[in-house]
């Protein structure tokens, strides 16, 4: 990785030219950590199902788990109702403080 900002997403600087693609069922916490150690400049979570967040299903917490060195961290939501996506984001943003959604 480099200390130079290659590009920005909003206010988030991406300092490197490798980005871990979001892959549901693959990009769990250990895999994101390994990719970060190998030079990934941005980590993306697995899909976070909005209904899991709204019903407090434990499955989403496993998919959301991360270490501070995984930052910048992007959340990706799975949902088909704008209101549910917004409600899930309002629950997770204070807790996770994602860099990108």
PLM feature spans:
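Glycine-rich, positively charged N-terminal anion/phosphate-binding segment
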Residues: 2-8, 23-100
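Non-catalytic, substrate/partner-engaging modules appended to enzymatic cores
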Residues: 14-15
């Amino acid at each position: 990785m480099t200390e130079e900002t290659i590009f920005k997403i909003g206010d988030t600087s991406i300092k490197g030219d490798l980005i871990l693609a979001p892959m549901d069922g693959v990009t769990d916490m250990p895999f994101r950590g390994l990719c970060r150690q190998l030079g990934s400049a941005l980590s993306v979570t697995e899909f976070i199902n909005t209904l899991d967040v709204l019903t407090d299903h434990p499955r989403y917490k496993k998919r959301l788990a991360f270490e501070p060195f995984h930052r910048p961290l992007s959340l990706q939501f799975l949902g088909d109702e704008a209101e549910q996506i917004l409600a899930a984001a309002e629950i997770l943003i204070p807790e996770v403080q994602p860099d990108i959604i």
